[in-house]
Amino acid sequence: MIEADRLISAAVINDEESIDRAIRPKLLTEYVGQPHVREQMEIFIQAAKQRGDALDHVLIFGPPGLGKTTLANIIANEMGVNLRTTSGPVLEKAGDLAAMLTNLEPHDVLFIDEIHRLSPVVEEILYPAMEDYQLDIMIGEGPAARSIKLDLPPFTLIGATTRAGSLTSPLRDRFGIVQRLEFYQVADLEHIVSRSAKCLGLELTPEGAHQLARRSRGTPRITNRLLRRVRDFAEVRADGAINGEVAMKALDMLNVDAEGFDFMDRKLLLAVIDKFMGGPVGLDNLAAAIGEERETIEDVLEPYLIQQGFIQRTPRGRIATNHAYKHFGITREE
């Protein structure tokens, strides 16, 4: 199964980006959850503005769908500067990055999503740009080639990644501010989905918001997607209002259970329980058993299952916990 086909995927699906932009918070005062990140960024931004400096470079990492792009937009808005957006895979050549850097205004924010996917050649260009606000470029070819230095205006690089461990040490060490985004609490997601419903002109009761929030895997992007699908159900099968009962019926129909698990989550858990006696099972064997790539299991399926205590990683492999057995009503054999 392709990850983007899953309703509870944290990846961006189809035209969601334009909808997300419309309901995205613009300022830190509107930003819900991540209290430590919010408090720290308030201080760092205010201090930079008081000094008249560009904000230090920021690395934001964590699972997909938690608001890394949203936070980058908020930082630029709070600093009162332009935001230039790109991604690691798009910057194929050094010239691609050089063109973006030379078009920055003083204190602008350059946001690079999936920064762990930068090519080594492009990454080398970033080092002097981040450290000294200088751009080293080669003019000409062969024996006549020469290096020239261009001064850049002070700017802020914001890098976002789901795989901070894949960043090289020289790049990681050049970020003065490092923020990890955690899965959201249900209460925060209730606040987020209520705000989104208001922006979309939907009637959502507190009970409806709770049902959506608790099945959203701690991820705002999933919360907002479920809201749109439950809206469809409410308009066709009810009077358009989303209360607790309507939300439960809609989410059950969509095959999203009370823990926010879908078919793939249940398939993984049952594979560990049934095919491997609860584990431990190695990642390659587990990937073969459910027909998924190991990277998909590591980056997409496992993080939430581990965070919720349904799977444990051990030196010998993955183990299904008592929570997993209880979820399926299976008695664990000792």
Swiss-Prot record:
SMART domains: AAA (SM00382). ATP binds at residues 23-24, 65, 68-70, 131-133, 174, 184, 221. This is Holliday junction branch migration complex subunit RuvB. Residues 185-255 are annotated as: Small ATPAse domain (RuvB-S). DNA binds at residues 294, 313, 318. Coiled coil: none annotated. It is an enzyme of class 3 (hydrolase). InterPro entries: AAA+_ATPase, AAA_lid_4, DNA_helicase_Holl-junc_RuvB, P-loop_NTPase, RuvB-like_N, RuvB_C, WH-like_DNA-bd_sf, WH_DNA-bd_sf.
